[in-house]
Amino acid sequence: MDKAKQIYLEFKREADFLELDFPLFLGDGPGFGELCMDYSEQDGYMLYGYERGKRNSEFKTTDFEEFKYEVFLHICWYMGMEFELRHWKEDMRHDDNILETDTRKIAFEKTLQLLKMVNPAWIDKAAQGYTAYLNLWRENKNVYFDKEAMEFKVNS
């Protein structure tokens, strides 16, 4: 078995064990924007979107742990976004300055909860990026991640 397939099956087993969706293809997918992975001696580990015969947003590394983090971050993020869509309220007034109306908060919290199941050590790194994103359009850059409660909050 080649190395790419071995890694793919290892990730799939772990995702199945943790009851995570596994929207990852080995090599190029059908071409409708799928999340794909591959490995080569020259480029190392690769994670990318595959759409219309082209690799997009390709992430490459030779560090296996960094690659595993990125794979599971993407898998958990997909599930977090799906969770957000199920909890979207059409009648809610959306305002980037009111954290409770920012549905990205819900998606990111769910993503971090799922990621914690895979590897709790990854929470801080992922939470930093999501906190920066939630603060991006806010007038007061006061969102922080409460690791104990596993939710984003606002400093008063």
Residue ranges of predicted features:
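N-terminal "first-domain core" detector
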Residues: 1-41
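Residues that form generic nucleotide/phosphate-binding pockets
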Residues: 10, 14, 70, 114
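A generic structural signal for ordered alpha-helices
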Residues: 15, 45-49, 89, 93
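Intrinsically disordered, low-complexity regulatory segments enriched in Ser/Thr/Pro
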Residues: 43-79
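Intrinsically disordered, low-complexity, charge-dense segments enriched in Lys/Arg
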Residues: 80-156
